[in-house]
A protein has these predicted regions:
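Short hydrophobic alpha-helical segments enriched in small aliphatic residues
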Residues: 5-7, 22, 29, 37
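Short, Lys/Arg-enriched N-terminal segments with co-localized hydrophobic residues
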Residues: 34-46
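N-terminal polybasic/positive-inside topogenic patches
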Residues: 7-12, 34
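Hydrophobic alpha-helical signal peptides and transmembrane signal-/tail-anchor segments
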Residues: 15-25
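Conserved beta-strand-loop surface patch within small alpha/beta domains used
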Residues: 44-123, 132-184
Length: 184
C-alpha cells in the first residue's frame, strides 16, 4: 500500500485541510496532483499512453523539419481501460505557418478520421510542437482543448538535441493532467 498525505493552510483563517488517500501501489504510479483556486488539493488518475518508438522517432523528425514553426498532427489507436495505444500517426499541415500556434488543415483532418475509421481505429487526440517553450499546454492550448477524453501531446524543442515529449489531458474546467507516456 502507498499512503499520500498533504495539507494546505489559508493564511486568513488558518484552515488546514488534510486529505489522506490510500491506494494500492499499482494505482499510485498514475496519480497526479492538481490545485484549485480554493487551495484545496485533489488527486486525479492519469492515463497511460503507449507509443511505438518508430512513431515517436517519426514525430521528432517531422517536428524538427517544421522548425521554426509549430508542427501538428493526429493520433489514432485503441483504448483498453486506462491505456491508450497509438497505432497510427497522421502528420498534418499547420495552416498558420507560425511558431506559437497552429491550425490543422481541415481537409487533412477529415481524411485522417476517415482513414482511422476504415482501419477500425479510434481517434485518440493530437500532437503539436512547441519550438521555444516547455512541453506543457499553453493557455491557448487549454482554451482550445475541446474534448476532455482526447490526448494532447506536446513536443518541446527548447533544446533541439533533447526534445521533450509529454502527453496531457485537459478537462472541461481546463485543468491539466499529465499522462504517463510509454515509448515501446
Amino acid at each position: 500500500m502507498c499512503r499520500h498525505a498533504f495539507a494546505t493552510c489559508r493564511s486568513q483563517d488558518y484552515l488546514i485541510i488534510l486529505f489522506i488517500y490510500v491506494f494500492s501501489s499499482s494505482v499510485c504510479a498514475g496519480l497526479t496532483l492538481d490545485k484549485y483556486e480554493s487551495d484545496i488539493f485533489y488527486w486525479r488518475m492519469s492515463m497511460v499512453i503507449r507509443m511505438k518508438k518508430s512513431d515517436y522517432d517519426s514525430i521528432v523528425r517531422y517536428c524538427l523539419d517544421g522548425l521554426p514553426n509549430e508542427s501538428c498532427g493526429l493520433i489514432a489507436g485503441f483504448v483498453d481501460g486506462d491505456v491508450k495505444s497509438v497505432e497510427k500517426v497522421y502528420f498534418l499541415t499547420n495552416l498558420d505557418n507560425n511558431n506559437v500556434h497552429f491550425t490543422m488543415d481541415p481537409k487533412e483532418q477529415f481524411a485522417a478520421v476517415k482513414d482511422a475509421r476504415s482501419l477500425g481505429l479510434t481517434m485518440l487526440g493530437n500532437f503539436h510542437s512547441h519550438p521555444e517553450t516547455p512541453s506543457r499546454p499553453s493557455e491557448e492550448d487549454k482554451r482550445l482543448a475541446y474534448d476532455s477524453t482526447a490526448v494532447y501531446m506536446i513536443m518541446s524543442f527548447m533544446d533541439n538535441d533533447n526534445p521533450v515529449f509529454k502527453a496531457f489531458g485537459v478537462d472541461k474546467d481546463k485543468n491539466v493532467t499529465e499522462h504517463v507516456l510509454e515509448i515501446v
